[in-house]
Design a protein with these regions (language model features):
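C-terminal charged capping/lid subdomain of soluble metabolic enzymes
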Residues: 303-376
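Glycine/threonine-rich beta-strand-loop-alpha-helix active-site module
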Residues: 73-175
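C-terminal catalytic subdomain
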Residues: 253-311
Length: 376
């Protein structure tokens, strides 16, 4: 069994105000700071940024105004912006896309090659500049992962730069920073965490240790969403822990059909990744259950029956209620119905057979069609 963790995590209310000290600990003297444009109006973020700039007067600032997930072309442009001023480290503050952008910039600044040449799992690359991540949304897990997602516009596919050298050196998680985010974004990010937990839990490559993280991450996130009190810092910390656990489990096992569906639908319709995954998650779980997979019972600590089958059915019932509570849509608003479900199933199957292979029961194009029909 193999298992890896890498990023130092600091989590707590107001911890982002201590960011200058955490940056100093990495021996940065001229940090490049990338931050989400939608944070600009946050008074708390302004206080964080003021502290950084006061401590590091020659900081290089970049406001990321790019909408949606970054492209390789955008990565090239941002890297060139920073290359002119030669920062000695990167601090990325924002949602998952901005954190991934920070990983890409940190790597490209020490590897003067086209960004597209690093897509996939690049080998023999130089170490990146040290990176500190500060998430403003909790669920993508980008703050602690080595994966950095980028879109290849020519192919219309979501790929990435996935080197273990991408691991952030530190991640500073402060629930206060997420408090001004729109609630729909908070929920979509939390659903992304649930997808990571479920896909990794059922993955053929799971280990006993990865499953501990899958279960803990699922329960923290699921019950925070169920309670409907996401305006509380304590609930946001549960989402933060769920995000860390889910992504750690995913890195140490593998994904499944839900993540695959989300990648395809998200790129095609520019849907936030977490919401795209949420659309499919429950129906993939139900498909697996109908095929005899009842191990989801382990995710349900409040089960009223010792029967794994009954406990899984009970959990799926709770999922139904959560979806109603959160108003998670089906595929109809995105133009899908019975008439084009087969085409969507075929396209997803052609693009993402690797994700399908991770499912705990056989999952193929016919399976995808079944799931999609139930969502139209």
């Amino acid at each position: 069994m193999q298992f890896f963790l890498s990023t130092d995590v600091i989590a707590g209310v107001n911890e982002a105000l201590n960011l200058p000290e955490y940056v100093r600990q990495l021996a940065m003297k001229k940090p490049g700071i990338i931050y989400d444009a939608n944070l600009s109006s946050s008074l708390y973020f302004q206080e964080i940024l003021k502290g950084l700039v006061s401590r590091f007067g020659n900081s290089v600032l970049f406001c990321n105004e790019f909408k949606g997930e970054p492209t390789y072309a955008h990565l090239e442009n941002v890297t060139e912006f920073f290359r002119r001023d030669a920062p000695d480290g990167i601090v990325a503050i924002g949602g998952g896309s901005t954190l991934d952008l920070g990983k890409g910039v940190a790597l490209l600044l020490t590897n003067e090659v086209p960004a597209l040449s690093l897509k996939g799992f690049p080998q023999d690359v130089n170490d990146p500049l040290p990176l500190v991540t500060v998430p403003s949304l909790l669920g993508s897990g980008a703050e602690i992962s080595f994966n950095a997602v980028f879109i290849d516009e020519a192919q219309g596919r979501k790929l990435g730069i996935n080197s273990r050298k991408n691991f952030p050196k530190k991640s500073v998680i402060d629930p206060q920073l997420s408090m001004t985010a729109p609630m729909e974004s908070v929920i979509a990010s939390a659903m992304d965490s649930l997808v990571h937990c479920i896909d990794s839990f059922g993955s053929h490559k799971h280990t006993p240790l990865s499953r501990i993280f899958s279960v803990e991450g699922f329960q923290r996130t699921f019950y925070a969403l169920q309670q409907g009190q996401l305006d509380r810092a304590e609930s946001r910390l549960d989402l933060a822990i769920g995000s860390i656990c889910g992504t750690t489990a995913l890195m140490n096992s593998g994904d499944g059909p839900t993540n695959g569906f989300a990648y395809y639908l998200g790129v095609k319709h520019k849907i936030p990744h977490g919401l795209a995954g949420a659309i499919f998650l429950k129906e993939v779980m139900r498909y697996n259950f109908d095929k005899g997979y009842d191990k989801y019972a382990l995710l349900n600590p409040m089960r009223s029956s010792p029967s794994a089958k009954d406990a899984t059915a009970e959990l799926l019932g709770e999922m139904d209620e959560l979806y109603r509570q959160l108003d998670i849509p089906d595929l109809v608003p995105y133009g899908y119905g019975q008439g084009n479900a087969a085409e969507l199933a075929r396209n997803v199957s052609d693009a993402l057979t690797g994700s399908f292979a991770g499912n705990p029961v056989e999952f193929n194009e016919d399976s995808a069609r079944h799931v999609i029909y139930n969502l139209t």
